[in-house]
């Protein structure tokens, strides 16, 4: 889950870090950068959350609540080259909809995390790119929808252009069509395995003696157990000026990355719809539309959270550690993705069940995808968190 962790940077890490980042004058989400205001916040396991396996699969709201369909072909052809529908089913035999009353066979009427939904999400994301400009802790984000060439500033901190802010502008462009499409075949397979492993850990329903093994239970939960849309609310940061919570709405963990907290829902809503209010007003849409749910996970994976690189950059071989990174033990590899997602809680300490879970999923998925990572820097026990 994206967890909240709160650090000092007007928006730093973050929630169980359920995964996204907090953006308040400067917070990223899950941990992202702690730069809530900056981008998002991104720690995922602050508070161990349980997800609800019994909720029915409602239909998504119509109209503006759902991202529009891209006008040009997306990037899923590349992802399809790496994983077939049959392999997807092999990876996730006990995904959401698998019920004990039915011998843990997925109920077709409740099947949510489908192969087709993932491919649709990849296509939708491929139509979007952003330019992130930072001046110190403050940022400006410009979004472009490629099929229409429509460009819009979706976030600009008040002090980004302040007369006193003499910081040099640091500019990054993120093209979401690059998801699992950069590098050699082996590099791309490893990135796909790493992405699926991390979202599997966030949504796992497995245990050591579970049918099929503990690492066959990724994507089992759709949202946290104990929450429903009518009575229980949580993960509301009431005093958040940029992304104020809507009355009676709950921002608990939902989707593959377990998106949590109103500031995270607001940020992903800005990105997808150029309007923060769509998901602030309708956070439940994340569990009504499986493609949207996968989009939240891809967004988190692809978006850098300064001073952190994106998980994509790490696995695609695009991240070059600074001398400070080297001094603090941070190296490219799967372990660095754990550090990005939830380093403050899982890294720079004795290896633990959470990091072992992520690695277990990663190794299994590499095998199913017919590849390996022989020189893997898979652990983060000697890596200091990004800060």
Model regions: which residues?
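GST-like fold's C-terminal all-alpha helical module
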Residues: 299-316, 320, 333-334
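Extracellular low-complexity, O-glycosylation-prone Ser/Thr/Pro/Gly-rich "stalks"
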Residues: 60-100, 318-387
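Peptidoglycan-targeting cell-wall enzymes and recognition modules
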Residues: 70-303, 330-333, 337-340
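Sec-dependent bacterial lipoprotein signal peptides
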Residues: 2-40
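Surface-exposed helix-capping loop/turn segments at secondary-structure junctions
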Residues: 128-130, 306-314, 371-374
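First exposed extracellular module after export/assembly in secreted or surface-exposed proteins
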Residues: 1-14, 55-65, 149-157, 166-168
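Short, well-ordered loop/turn and helix-capping segments at boundaries between secondary-structure elements
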Residues: 44, 265, 303-307, 367-371
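Bacterial Sec-dependent N-terminal signal peptides
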Residues: 31, 35-70
